[in-house]
Amino acid sequence: MKLWGGRFRESESELMEEFNASLSFDKKLYEEDIEGSIAHVKMLNKCKIINNEECEEILSGLKSLYKDIRSGKLKIEGDYEDIHSFVEVNLIDRIGAVGKKLHTARSRNDQVAVDMKMYVKKSSYIIIECINKLMETIKDKAENNHFIMPGYTHMQRAQVVTFTHHMMAYYSMFNRDKKRIDNAISNLNESPLGCCALAGTTYDTDREMTSKELGFSKPVDNFLDGVSDRDYIIEVLSAFSICMMHLSRLSEELIIWSTKEFSFIQMDDKFSTGSSIMPQKKNPDAAELIRGKTGRVYGDLIAMLTIMKGIPLAYNKDMQEDKEQFFDSFDTLKMCILVMDGMIATMTVKKEAMKEAVKGGFLNATDVADYLVNKGVAFRDAHKISGELVIYCENNDKAIEELNINEFKNFCNLFDEDVYEFINYNNVIKKGNKKIM
């Protein structure tokens, strides 16, 4: 069932119908399509393009369609080209010929553009809510596990940090992700409804009214731009991809920390799986799947950039491919955030394992150098002395803090008994701007 065909002598081939149809996936837009149609009908009535009785009949029909779809009474299926065809044809079946007036002063080009903008905006707000929940979980886990642990550069133990500070780094990352998505919402918040196919309409319509009715800040400035660009989807997918990158980095650390080699955390059974052959295995599959699905969201972004890169103005059918990319990214990101939230909330942080890792990594070597700087030694010389001290400790299987004062003085006679307090790991994180950790 199509909304066109008058100028054609022959019907599409079955192959072309199957190739061209999008109902199987754009049915997700039924709420937005009906909501946009309701706003459009109200505007047609206000502008005296349809009368009050016609307006009420169409509105009643649209609302009954929405109710029946929501309840499952009406299934979105059948021989329809897209969700727009499904809604309009079913409306006409219900209310008769007056339903044919719904599409006055509107094209599917501005119709699908407004549907997608509304869906992207709604979905983006859902992602922001999910990020907020994850951030609170991270903060709670961080604040309730204020333990020292190794901080790493190049995956080598570097300096002592706290588990709190380490986790709050991800809190900051996700906070920026949230801001990026919110900014993308601001950029897309202009209504394309009323642009029609590409050049507006000869009817004296009220785009300000439909824009306000649908929750947009204003109508788009340019008809061609309104129906032909999907940069707002690309911008949101870019923000989604960056968020997935942060989820993937966190997943990688959780995977490493959960190994016996590290044993910094223990994953809860609720977010772990086992092996079909090795009974002892407890695998961090949830984190691994998040890490893997990051590539999937990246792929959706690259697909959208590629779809749009060579399209002339205005609308082209290529743009039908925007929907599956966005739907997939939204569903994937939402699920990954929810799973990460569950993993963080239920995992156990192992204080003693982190503490032992700190002791074995010479993580106070920089503090030894700082101690000597406070005694008047130039930092570069202090750095050299501290490095030589580390070699001595490695050769003698000792931690720096285990050296006696005479061993310290063999490297520099400025060392005194106060060095032990200065390089104590629990004291180190309380000095200077480290206090924020």
UniProtKB/Swiss-Prot annotation:
One of its GO terms (biological process) is L-arginine biosynthetic process. It holds the Pfam family Lyase_1. SUPFAM superfamilies: L-aspartase-like. HAMAP family: Arg_succ_lyase. The gene is argH. This is Argininosuccinate lyase. Its EC number is 4.3.2.1. It comes from Clostridium acetobutylicum (strain ATCC 824 / DSM 792 / JCM 1419 / IAM 19013 / LMG 5710 / NBRC 13948 / NRRL B-527 / VKM B-1787 / 2291 / W). The lineage of its organism: Bacteria, Bacillati, Bacillota, Clostridia, Eubacteriales. One of its GO terms (cellular component) is cytosol. It is an enzyme of class 4 (lyase). InterPro entries: Arg_succ_lyase_C, Argininosuccinate_lyase, Fumarase/histidase_N, Fumarate_lyase_CS, Fumarate_lyase_fam, Fumarate_lyase_N, L-Aspartase-like. It is found in: Cytoplasm. Keywords: Amino-acid biosynthesis, Arginine biosynthesis, Cytoplasm, Lyase. Its main location: cytoplasm. Disulfide bonds: none annotated. Belongs to the lyase 1 family. Argininosuccinate lyase subfamily. Pathway: Amino-acid biosynthesis; L-arginine biosynthesis; L-arginine from L-ornithine and carbamoyl phosphate: step 3/3.
